[in-house]
Curated annotation (Swiss-Prot):
This protein's record includes keyword Chloroplast: no
Complex and partners: Homodimer.
Any GO CC annotation of this UniProt entry: plasma membrane
Designated name of the protein: SPbeta prophage-derived sublancin-168-processing and transport ATP-binding protein SunT
Listed Pfam families: ABC_membrane, ABC_tran, Peptidase_C39
Annotated compartments: Cell membrane
Protein topology in the membrane: Multi-pass membrane protein
Principal localisation: membrane
Organism: Bacillus subtilis (strain 168)
Alphabetized PANTHER family for the sequence: ATP-BINDING CASSETTE SUB-FAMILY B, ATP-BINDING CASSETTE SUB-FAMILY B MEMBER 6
Its EC number(s): 3.4.22.-, 7.-.-.-
Length: 705
C-alpha cells in the first residue's frame, strides 16, 4: 500500500502572490522544493497574476497544464474527474484569489488557502459561492524529478550529525556525567539533615564533604570538555553552512542578484547564526534536559508519588503555555528578520553612494529614510521582546507558585511523619532541577522559532534551482569561430520580451558596434551571449552548435563581458588583475599597456603592489574602467563584450584603446548609446523597442562606416 503524501501549505508573502504560493505548494507536494522567491524570478513581480501567468510559470518548468472552465451547477461532478491537486480561481480583487484543492469530501473540500496559516476545510456551499468556474489542472506525468542539489533542512543537519557522530556522542556522554554529578550533589543536604546532624557524625562529615567536593571538581572537568566540544561542533556547523551557502551563491543565475538587494543576500547568511547556535548548543542541551526530566521523574515517583503528581501539574501548564505562544512567536520572528534585511539593504545602498548623498546635500533625506526603515525593525524587535517577556512572566508565575505549593504539600507530609525533612529537601532540590530543565527547554521556544524562520530563509537560497551542466555529452568550448542567433527571445514574460526576434551572424574577427537608447535590450542581448541569462534552446549557436550543448564555465572563459561598473576588491593592483590566476609580469604589463593604464600605475607608490581600497575608491572611475579592461585582456578572451565599460575614460585614452581593440585578434562587441567617431567597426546594430531595427555591414575592416 502506497504511503499517503503529506499535503503542503505555502503562505503568501503579499496579497497579490496567492497564485505563486499555490504553485509552490503543488511543486513541494511533488518533492520540488521551490519557493515563491524562485517563482518571482521566473515571471517577475506584478500587482497580480492571471491564469495565463500561472500557465507560463509551469511551462517554463516543463510542466504541462490544462485550464478548464466548469459548467455552473455541475461543479463537483466535474471536479471528481480532475486530477488533484489542482488550482482553483475564486472571486477576489482584480485577478481573483487562488487556492489549491487537495481533496473533495462529502460536505467540504480540503484546501491550501495561501491567505490562511495552514491546510483548511471549506464547505461546498461556501466554495460554490466564490468559485469563478476556472480550474488549472496539472499533468503529474510532466513534473520533473527532484533536483539533486536540493537539501531538506532535516537531511542537511542529519548529515552533519552523522559526520560528527563521535563529537556528538562525547558531548552527550559528558553532559550526562555533568547532570548526573549535579543531581548526586543533591544528596549532600539529605545526608546532613537525616544522618550527620541527628547522629553527630563529625568524622563522617569531613569524609562526605570531601567526596562531594571531589564530585564538584570532576563535574567541572567534564563541563570543560563538554563546552570545548560544543564550541568545536559549532565551528564545524558554521563552516559547513558557510561553504554550502557561498558555493550555492556562486552558482546562482545573474537575475537572482538583479532582483534582490545586496542586504537581502547578506542578511540571509547572517540569519544562519540562529541555526548554528540552536543546533550546536541548544539541541544537545535539549536532549540532556529531556533525559534529565524523565530520569528525575522516575526518581521522584519512586520517592514520593504524591509530590510527583504535584510536580506534574506545572509541567502540563508550562507545556500548554509553550503551545499557545508557538505560532505567535513564529510570525513575530519572521517579521523581525524581514525588517532586518530591509534595514541592512538600505544602509548598504546609501553607504556605497555617500558621495552622491553629500554632493546633493541629502544627508537629511538619508537619515529620514533610514530612521523610517530602522524604526520598523525596532518596532518588530520590541514586539518580539514583549511576547518573550509575557511568556517568561507567565512561566515565572507558574514555577514560583508551584515551588511554594510543593513545599506546602511536602511540609504537611513531614508534619504527619510520612516523610523526613531531609527527603523533603532532597525532593525539593530534584524538583528544582526538573523545573529548571523544563524551563530551559521551553525557553528555547524563541530560539527555535528564530532558527526555524532563519532556516527557511537560508534554504530558500541553498535550494534555489540553478543551471545544471549534468549532461555527460556537454562539449568543452575551446575556440569560437562564429556566433549565430536564430529568433532569439529573452524575457520572463512571453508577451513582453526584453530581447525579441534577434537574427544575426558574428564572425571571429568582427568588430561590432551596438547602439541604442537605455532599456532597448542591448545589455540583455550581450549577457545572453555569455550565458549569464538562461538561453532558450536552438536560439544561439557557437560554431554551429547550440550554446546549451556547451559547458557554461568554458563559455565564460572564452566570452568575457564587462559592464560600466568595474569590480575591484581590497588588495593590490596585481591581485585585482590576476584574480587567482598566475601570469608573469610581462603579460600583466602588456595588458595594462594595451588598456592605457600602465603609465598611471607606474606613477603610483609601489606600482603594481599598490593597495586598492574597497571598490577601488582610491582611483578615479576612468582608471578603474581601464584596470577592468586590462584584466579582461589579460585573460585572453575570444569574444570581448564592452557594455558602456569605457564611458568614463578621457577622449585621448579612449582613442588609443579603440586602436588597440581594432588590432586584437578576437571578436569585439562595443555597446554604447551613441556612435563613437574613433571606433573602427565592420558591423553596426541599432536596437529600438527590444529589436534590431537597423544593421549595416562593411567588408573593409580598416575603416568605420
Amino acid at each position: 500500500m502506497n504511503k499517503k503524501k503529506k499535503y503542503v501549505h505555502t503562505k503568501q508573502f503579499n496579497s497579490h502572490d496567492c497564485g505563486l504560493a499555490c504553485i509552490s505548494s503543488i511543486l513541494k507536494f511533488h518533492n520540488l522544493n521551490y519557493g515563491i522567491d524562485f517563482l518571482l524570478d521566473l515571471i517577475g513581480d506584478k500587482e497580480g497574476y492571471s491564469l495565463r501567468d500561472l500557465i507560463v510559470i509551469f511551462k517554463k518548468m516543463g510542466i504541462k497544464t490544462r485550464p478548464l472552465e466548469l459548467q455552473e451547477n455541475k461543479t463537483f461532478e466535474a471536479l471528481k474527474q480532475i486530477k488533484l491537486p489542482c488550482i482553483a480561481l475564486l472571486e477576489g480583487e482584480e485577478y481573483g484569489h487562488y487556492i489549491t484543492i487537495y481533496e473533495i469530501r462529502n460536505n467540504y473540500l480540503l484546501v491550501s488557502d495561501p491567505d490562511k496559516d495552514k491546510i483548511t476545510k471549506i464547505k461546498k456551499e461556501d466554495f460554490e459561492s466564490k468559485f469563478t468556474n476556472f480550474i488549472l489542472e496539472i499533468d503529474k506525468e510532466s513534473i520533473p524529478e527532484k533536483e539533486k542539489d536540493q537539501k531538506k533542512h532535516s537531511y542537511f543537519f542529519k548529515d552533519i550529525l552523522f559526520r560528527n557522530k563521535l563529537i556528538v556522542f562525547v558531548i552527550l556522554l559528558t553532559s550526562l556525567f555533568v547532570v548526573g554529578l549535579a543531581v548526586a550533589g543533591s544528596f549532600y543536604i539529605k545526608f546532613l539533615v537525616d544522618l550527620i546532624i541527628p547522629r553527630s557524625l563529625r568524622e563522617s562529615l569531613i569524609t562526605i564533604t570531601l567526596i562531594f567536593i571531589s564530585m564538584v571538581l570532576i563535574r567541572c572537568i567534564f563541563d570543560f570538555v563538554r563546552s570545548y566540544l560544543i564550541i568545536k561542533l559549532s565551528y564545524k556547523v558554521d563552516k559547513e553552512m558557510s561553504n554550502v551557502y557561498f558555493n550555492k551563491v556562486t552558482k546562482l543565475p545573474i537575475n537572482f542578484f538583479e532582483n534582490r538587494e545586496d542586504g537581502e543576500v547578506i542578511s540571509r547568511f547572517n540569519d544562519g547564526i540562529y541555526i548554528k547556535d540552536f543546533f550546536s548548543a541548544n539541541f544537545v542541551t535539549a536532549i540532556i534536559d529531556i533525559i534529565l526530566i524523565l530520569g528525575l521523574g522516575v526518581i521522584l515517583y519512586r520517592t514520593n508519588n504524591i509530590l510527583f503528581l504535584t510536580i506534574i501539574l506545572p509541567i502540563l501548564l508550562l507545556s500548554c503555555l509553550a503551545i499557545l505562544f508557538f505560532d505567535h512567536l513564529k510570525k513575530k520572528n519572521q517579521k523581525l528578520m524581514e525588517d532586518k534585511a530591509k534595514s541592512t539593504s538600505l544602509l548598504i545602498n546609501f553607504l556605497k553612494n555617500m558621495t552622491t548623498v553629500y554632493s546633493l546635500n541629502k544627508t537629511s533625506f538619508f537619515l529620514e529614510k533610514f530612521h523610517l526603515t530602522y524604526d520598523k525593525q525596532l518596532n518588530s524587535t520590541f514586539s518580539v521582546a514583549k511576547a518573550v517577556i509575557s511568556n517568561e512572566i507567565l512561566k515565572g508565575l507558574i514555577q514560583n507558585s508551584f515551588t511554594i505549593i510543593i513545599l506546602w504539600v511536602g511540609t504537611r507530609q513531614v508534619l504527619n511523619d510520612s516523610m523526613s525533612l531531609g527527603t523533603l529537601l532532597f525532593i525539593n532540590t530534584l524538583a528544582a532541577f526538573l523545573l529548571s530543565s523544563l524551563d530551559r527547554i521551553l525557553s528555547m521556544q524563541s530560539d527555535l522559532q528564530q532558527a526555524h524562520v532563519a532556516s527557511i530563509r537560508f534554504f530558500d537560497v541553498v535550494n534555489y534551482p540553478v543551471q545544471q551542466d549534468s549532461n555527460e555529452n556537454l562539449t568543452e568550448l575551446d575556440f569560437i569561430q562564429n556566433i549565430k542567433t536564430v529568433n532569439l527571445n529573452i524575457g520572463a514574460d512571453p508577451m513582453r520580451y526584453i530581447v525579441e526576434d534577434i537574427n544575426l551572424i558574428l564572425d571571429r574577427k568582427d568588430k561590432v558596434l551596438i547602439i541604442g537608447e537605455s532599456g532597448t535590450g542591448k545589455s540583455t542581448f550581450a549577457k545572453s551571449l555569455s550565458k549569464l541569462y538562461k538561453v532558450p534552446d536552438k536560439s544561439i549557436y557557437l560554431n554551429g552548435l547550440d550554446i546549451n550543448r556547451y559547458d557554461h564555465l568554458s563559455i565564460r572563459k572564452r566570452i568575457v563581458y564587462i559592464d560600466e561598473n568595474p569590480f575591484l576588491f581590497k588588495g593590490t593592483i596585481k591581485e585585482n588583475l590576476c584574480m587567482g590566476e598566475i601570469f608573469d609580469q610581462n603579460e600583466i604589463e602588456n595588458a595594462c599597456i594595451m588598456s592605457q593604464c600602465h603609465e598611471f600605475i607606474c606613477n603610483l607608490d609601489k606600482q603594481y603592489s599598490y593597495k586598492l581600497s574597497e571598490n577601488g575608491s582610491n582611483l578615479s572611475t576612468g582608471q578603474k574602467q581601464r584596470l577592468a579592461l586590462a584584466r579582461a585582456i589579460l585573460h585572453q578572451p575570444q569574444v570581448l563584450i564592452l557594455d558602456e565599460s569605457l564611458s568614463n575614460i578621457d577622449p585621448d585614452n579612449t582613442k588609443l584603446i579603440y586602436e588597440t581593440l581594432h588590432r586584437m585578434d578576437c571578436l569585439i562587441i562595443l555597446i554604447t548609446h551613441n556612435d563613437p567617431s574613433n571606433f573602427k567597426y565592420n558591423k553596426k546594430l541599432v536596437f529600438r523597442n527590444n529589436r534590431i531595427i537597423e544593421s549595416s555591414y562593411s567588408e573593409n575592416k580598416e575603416y568605420s562606416i
